[in-house]
């Protein structure tokens, strides 16, 4: 240090003053250093190194701040991103993809699923039971009605997210069991049904509680419906052919397969034909008994029916037509035999009956006209008996049978 324009005594006075001031400031500096060492445990930010808040992005000028996920936060800025809960006083907080969550929201969104029965969390190490998109504790997977625990392989049903054992679910579908109906009653009923079945009892004894036993698969009728029994040989032919008659007051029905429950009798949906549809189909049947795919397509356009319905109708019509012809032939033979017996026709070898008086022959003649689509088919059976035989009345009328097939 250089001192210019100062005498010797003045220089010594200045040096003494500087020494005195240095001695008086030394204790204050040491006390400040000691006090700073004790306050370093408190989170504070000095003005020369102020940090930015990870929540709002502003500078942290507060004396105290929060440190979470290796970032600084204002005490008011550390909040849950879902429910906006202030996490200043919370013991824990969770971070996922840069977002802060409270404990409840984190477990709700990212943790394991909760039990659908008790609504408690399920840890990753627990064994669970799954039904649809729901998860259950092993002890919580029980029947809602009887609290029977269901294990792997047991049959169960679900309705409105509620689990039922097989027996109670069947009863629930029928809506027949009372509120006090428990699993013991159903088990007793099942045992009684099994005993009754082994003893050969009927349906009433086999199911005392009236519960339909459900096997999980709906019963559906397969294949074609069973054929109805045709009328016997002695049935009235006109009444039998009335099903194919077309008039203003009658309509024909077609049986079709219909799924039906196993606990009820067979129910079939019946298709009714209108009069113009029947006339069109019967007119074509008089020309062709077995239409091909092209003909069926044309008929479907004319009648408005499906090809399947038309196929079934023509199949039934062909079957009835064949049965009527066979029955008519049998009826003609029977009447010819009866007439021959009444007139005393001699029986013997064929050589003894070769007389001209037996002409025309008593064999029935069948005439079938299918050329006109609008006229009904007439089948005539003519039985002639020789008039020169003894015991035969000369004016006996011939027997004629007219059969209307439509």
Swiss-Prot record:
Protein name (record): LIM/homeobox protein Lhx2
Region (Disordered): 250-270, 328-374, 387-406
Species of the source: Homo sapiens
Residue ranges constituting the LIM zinc-binding domain according to the UniProt record: 53-105, 115-168
UniProt short sequence motif Nuclear localization signal, positions renumbered to this chain: 307-323
Biased composition (Polar residues): 328-356, 396-406
Keyword Magnesium found: no
Role description: Acts as a transcriptional activator. Stimulates the promoter of the alpha-glycoprotein gene. Transcriptional regulatory protein involved in the control of cell differentiation in developing lymphoid and neural cell types.
Gene designation per UniProt: LHX2
GO aspect biological process, one term: hair follicle development
